[in-house]
């Protein structure tokens, strides 16, 4: 019989932190791993898992040789073997400031930039820095990127949602945003270019967002990791342009633009020309949080200036040409699957954000069930919309080779054909109805 006491016969004093379970429950990685476990290893079909959003796994989406050589040179230099300062090394911070300044009226210096272990660490630090008030809440988009939800839950920051409007090209519902805020709201998160919807916000709309943030007295956290994944007609506008209206914390990384999510190097930039963040103690809180967290790889920090400054335009042009081809192919193939509908062709990112009509399917009640059965029966892993805050939507990653995309949509079509509700011909339906009536009498 197990002895649950310690050596003195007393009860052990420790137990697991349930806050981690609560936060992980809304984390995207946990859902992806859960879906992987539903894969049928006896199916004979290799799993096609495009939905984690990693085009870097595809031969058509390889990073730039300039970036690879910069990392190799940094590793060989002997200058990247020590610890880095908590905010990041000056040359990396200066390079990020210069990289962002080309589009900003109020120029950044290296003192305004902090280097992080990818954008996810930047999210964690910013949210932790704003969570001092136990009554504080944060406004997050619906649909949105679930790492914000997970970190807010972990930091005991109340989450309030505002909607993105599909009928208005996924613009922010500003009236709904204002209604969700109160005197304890500290920030709103803006994702532009948008994951998962694939839209790019206009100058006028971003200006209205800044005016609303000023009215509410909140900081805008602007997630701009997809700024180099824009292939539509609308240009990307950085939120920092409007920092004179309301303070903006810009989050970015090289993960998506350079196709290297595994390198884990990103940044936070304080667009604060009126020193509002500094006066409120937010800058100090961010620096304190950085002192408590591991520093990003010094090799990547040493390489960052060359990556940002020397990557040729041709690299981005080639990548965007490949993405446009993937979008067109996927958008057309989707038309063969009646239960899935994409309301707007994406202009950015590497996803189709697709509405699911479960009324056309047998024994599938919602998006989660659709995705779980799809991976079990056809070995295709998609992300259910519920993971991103939207019921009966599905996110399909399209950043892969054309042959793989064709196979993905072939399998989804097979799945649809298997589960589609069959409509009986009128003559047969009438015959069955009359036959049933005769049996009842």
Report residues per predicted region.
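PLP-dependent enzyme catalytic core of the Aspartate aminotransferase-like
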Residues: 98, 102, 363-364, 369-382, ...
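Eukaryotic N-terminal low-complexity, Ser/Thr- and Lys/Arg-rich leader segments
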Residues: 1-27, 420-441
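Helix C-cap/helix->beta junction micro-motif
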Residues: 155, 215-216, 246, 378, ...
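Conserved core segment of the aminotransferase class I/II
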Residues: 4-5, 69-70, 241-324, 328-336, ...
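Conserved glycine-rich beta-strand-loop-beta hairpin in the small C-terminal domain of fold type I
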Residues: 305, 320-331, 342-359
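Conserved core of the PLP fold type I
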Residues: 72, 76-212, 228-242, 249, ...
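N-terminal small-domain helix-loop-helix segment of the aminotransferase-like
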Residues: 8-118, 125, 176, 295, ...
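Generic structural signal for small/hydrophobic residues in well-ordered secondary structure
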Residues: 50, 71, 96, 113, ...
